Amino acid sequence: MNPLMRVIGLAAAILLFAPAGHAQTINRSQCIQYGGNAICWGPVQGRWKHAVCGEVGSFTSWSIAQCQAQGGTWANGNCTGLPPQELWRPATEGDLVPLAKDQFSNFHGPLCDGPNATGYTWGVAISSGLCSTAGPGPVLVQGYEQHNNTNFFTVSGKKLSGGVCGPADTTLNFSASRDRPVQCPGGDDQSFLFTTGSTPALCSLGFRYPITPRQCSECDAKFANQQVGNPIDPITGVKRQVEVDYAGSGPHPLRFERVYHNRIYVLDGKKWRHNYSARIEFHNFGTVPTAFAHRAGGRSYSYTFNGSLFVPNVDIDDKLTKLTDAGGALTGWQFLEVASHTLETYDAAGKLVSITSRAGLTQTLEYSTVSTPPAVAHEPGLLIRVTDHFGRQLNFTYDAIGRMATMQDPAGQTYLYGYNSQSLLTKVTYPDSKDREYLYNEAGLAAGGAWPPGLLTGIQDENNVRFASYSYDSVGMAYRTEHAGVVNRVTVSHGSWPSSVTVTDARGTVRTHTYQSLNGVYLNTGVTQPAANGVGTAATAATYGTNNNISMRRDFNGNRTNYNSYDLTRNLETSRTEGLTSAGATTPATRTIESQWHATFRLPTLITEKNSAGTVLRTTSMTHDSNGNVLTRTITAGGNSRTWTYTYDANGAVLTVDGPRTDVTDVTTYTYYANSATCPGAAALGCRGQVETVTNAAGHVTSIAEYDAHGRPLAIVDPNGLTTDLVYDPRQRLTSRNVGGETTDYEYDGVGQLKKVTLPDGSFLSYTYDAAHRLTQVTDNAGNRIAYTLDAMGNRTKEEVFDTTNTLKRTLTRVYETLNRLIYEAHP
């Protein structure tokens, strides 16, 4: 995209557009036979819960001391005013001794010296006393520590008596304990299915589908991505919801994107990941080392060591590399997302530490340590900061049990995250104080009731209106999505799973989707549709070949494309033929496209287009620099060639574009603010790496004089010296555009829908929407209006124009058939 268009795109866009039960267990070979790819891992360890015990006994005074140490008030034999139980002390191990000291001081009254405490050691048996345990620690489950206790440690202090500091210490013995759940991730089979020799028992990924006996409870049942509705995957029953809280601008921008996935299972009940939550998990399964790349979007890919490399399933192109020191010890991992050539680096524990773009721009991730202030995080290992290549930051804080509490964007604005008692995300409060709420396992929408937990059943938007609903069957498979008023309702029936499913749209039209299992992946092989408006039933078709690459695709009209060849080492298409008959015969419209590819990047270097006779019609050739940026692009057709030439800066941003003309100079030039620039205007870092000037072929210069902290332009000066000033709201929406003293204002509702545009002369247009976020009316300042009636599919079935006296002046009606195609329009 032209860099100038990139920086002013938001303004331009606004101006141009107004708006069940457990499955049968089978072995690994059966799993693969039935289309799954067995993925297993060790039990998951939950968060430690700490406790401190004083050797006192049951005394009211001791109960009062404990109550006060927790921040409560003792009244009428009860402790009141306590914080929620998940926030009770001790939140971390570091709070054990301070809590014991507080209890001691509250119990013994005023002290003139102390309290003082001796140290403690984990793993010591306590065999007597009021704080005794059943046995010495630690207690292990499958080799993982589940419980441990400390030796007695002593808290002492001198009491003040009669104004005199006591001669001897008063003492009290305490012990501490820590416990955590050790089990398979929620949703996995809890019986630890796989045991290999002396290797600790392993968990199996428990996808639960309502079919028997062909059920792979320990399979990562992978399927082709084909989403319907808002959205769900019809074959897997996966509900996936992407919510973008923050999006910066410029090269390799900061972004905070949350992803809900109903089949993410972790011990604390969370169902949301974010774009910085990818991780690597490594296990030695007997003699076969295996690593899992858990992606931010909810998918997990397994990589098996073949003696020299970690190799994924044949349909996965992304690369995983183990990093070691000179002695062969694991130091980290690198994951290459091949499509974008983005390189992710992980530490030895599998935490994501950096993300580097193809141009070499890096975002760095920082995590909490034992020395991190409690106001930021109470425990180590939590993401607290992401810093981009230019110094802009996202900062995060957490509550006492490790849940993300706030995010601060580069402008210093704060986003708040709220949770229910199951630690499920229930509310996000944005910088404009608007709330977006999430509902789970609601009656009538989750057939299994509270199981599986964490099923997203509804979203209430920032207008405080319920916008979306999702329904699940008794085993947690999503089968229906709809917007407010049953708009865009899509219902999936899994009765013939996994060979086919049926999908019913909001019009009641039923389509059947069929699937084929290949290399552990279910691939869509076709969709049928019913007859409509005199046209008979029809179906699409698809077939697949080596490495699950598509070999043929046919649309509803019988038009066919053959995929002739691939570079199978990289799964890159090298030849396809389009415009064939249903049987594969050539037609006058037939053409073949042949592609050659860059040796490193998934970028074409030569595209050749031929007609049905094999005659070359056009070629497009590209050369690239070492970062994959296009240096030259040449199009040759009819014996004529045109060439564009590009240059770039160190950030991969375009410096010059030299067009194809040779008779005149047609070079456009761009300059950028330095990576270390301290910028004029509202934000010191906002302009870094952003466009500073654009000079066209005639030498006319447009400059962007100011940027905000998000990288959005605030002041644009055109070649005539005329300045355009732009103002945004806290959600980065354009609210004002002043050009030479003439101001246009924009207003939005809570979800960001444009409500009103007021022009410099005071005239305006206002926009009205329904609860499903669809435009239903446009009104001008004189009172003229256009009203839209929409069906459940979003089609405008009626348009009515009213004048200032509310008199109907014109009506337009439309009728749509079963397949949602317009068949009738009337202008009475």
Please annotate each region the language model reported:
Residues 3, 16, 21-265:
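Intrinsically disordered, low-complexity segments enriched in small residues
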